[in-house]
Amino acid sequence: MALHDIREVRIPIELDKPRTLLFDLNAFAELEDKFGSLDQAFQKMQAGSVKATRTLLWAGLLHEDEKLTERQVGAMISLTNVEKIMEQITQALTAALPEDTGTAENAVAPDPQ
């Protein structure tokens, strides 16, 4: 993923109040610091890690309030809304990242004719 491929798409989310998820460069940098890679963060959330879900949500909200803590964000999540939050995180991440165009392994060589 090239930095210029990141799309800043805001996804509305209802938590303690109406907010927006935004995975911008700063959010991705925070996730890289916490997990080593965005893939690791997403895989942990998909595996059901509440800590990963909380951290992803926190990173997506930092654009609104840089002083927001993970514990404060955790208080916005409940058992009744966690699934919807995970769906919205997935939607926001998908919107922010470029479409996968395949890897070099899957590329077809041009016909030399």
Which role does the model predict for each range below?
Residues 1-10, 17, 29, 33-51, ...:
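Charged interaction scaffolds used for protein-protein
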Residues 24:
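Residue-level signal for threonine
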Residues 19-21:
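Short, isolated positions in well-ordered beta-strands
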